[in-house]
Amino acid sequence: MKDPRDIIKRPIITENTMNLIGQKKYTFEVDVKANKTEVKDAVEKIFGVKVEKVNIMNYKGKFKRVGRYSGYTNRRKKAIVTLTPDSKEIELFEV
């Protein structure tokens, strides 16, 4: 099994994801090859919380051109992790 820190790349902080935190839903950018079970285990191990469910979205790379060179940006995978009602919250901004 991979190291949990290799699976969870970073939290995604936007206005929409900050509104979801009130519902105990946290959004992370994860490794492209990770599946729902690996994401669940990684979040539980890193943050010490209980995960109820995981929703995953795949994003393909966008086509970009710079002068005569063209190519695609990197693929991404985003995971929305829902915690159980009795689980503690994840501290994204430590004081």
UniProtKB/Swiss-Prot annotation:
Biological process, per Gene Ontology: translation
MF (Gene Ontology): rRNA binding; structural constituent of ribosome
Pfam families from the UniProt entry: Ribosomal_L23 (PF00276)
Cited InterPro entries: Nucleotide-bd_a/b_plait_sf, Ribosomal_uL23-like, Ribosomal_uL23/eL15/eS24_sf, Ribosomal_uL23_CS
NCBIfam families: PRK05738.2-4 (NF004363)
PANTHER family: 60S RIBOSOMAL PROTEIN L23A
Protein's recorded name: Large ribosomal subunit protein uL23
Name of the gene encoding the protein in the UniProt record: rplW
